[in-house]
Amino acid sequence: MSESSDISAMQPVNPKPFLKGLVNHRVGVKLKFNSTEYRGTLVSTDNYFNLQLNEAEEFVAGVSHGTLGEIFIRCNNVLYIRELPN
């Protein structure tokens, strides 16, 4: 299957129920810049889609740069959010 057909097979997801379902789950949050991703447990989200993570770890270009603990990510910096396996 080609990449374009993979993309066309994706179904749109309503973001509010999607994020609500990820609370208390491990997630990866990719930022729009610097190839930065934060991985941690989603504690909460608000109506603007700002995110609070606990036990967060920072990755730049796939390399861990340490554990940060509890962090807040402003919504306009987020490229995508994905659920991580436990």
UniProtKB/Swiss-Prot annotation:
| Broad class of the protein's primary localization | nucleus
Q: Determine the domain of life of the protein's source.
A: Eukaryota
Query: Where in this chain does the record put each Sm domain?
Result: 14-86
- Per UniProt, which keywords does this protein have? Cytoplasm, mRNA processing, mRNA splicing, Nucleus, Ribonucleoprotein, RNA-binding, Spliceosome
Q: Cite the Gene3D superfamilies for this sequence.
A: 2.30.30.100
Compartments it resides in? Nucleus; Cytoplasm
**One term under GO cellular component:** U5 snRNP
- SMART domains, per database record: Sm
Physiological role: Plays a role in pre-mRNA splicing as a core component of the spliceosomal U1, U2, U4 and U5 small nuclear ribonucleoproteins (snRNPs), the building blocks of the spliceosome.
| Additional remark text | Present with 2570 molecules/cell in log phase SD medium.
Oligomer status and interactors: Component of the Sm core complex, present in spliceosomal snRNP U1, U2, U4/U6 and U5. The core complex contains SMB1, SMD1, SMD2, SMD3, SME1, SMX3 and SMX2 (Sm proteins B, D1, D2, D3, E, F and G, respectively), and is probably a heptameric ring structure. SMX3 specifically interacts with SME1.
**What's the protein here called?**
Small nuclear ribonucleoprotein F
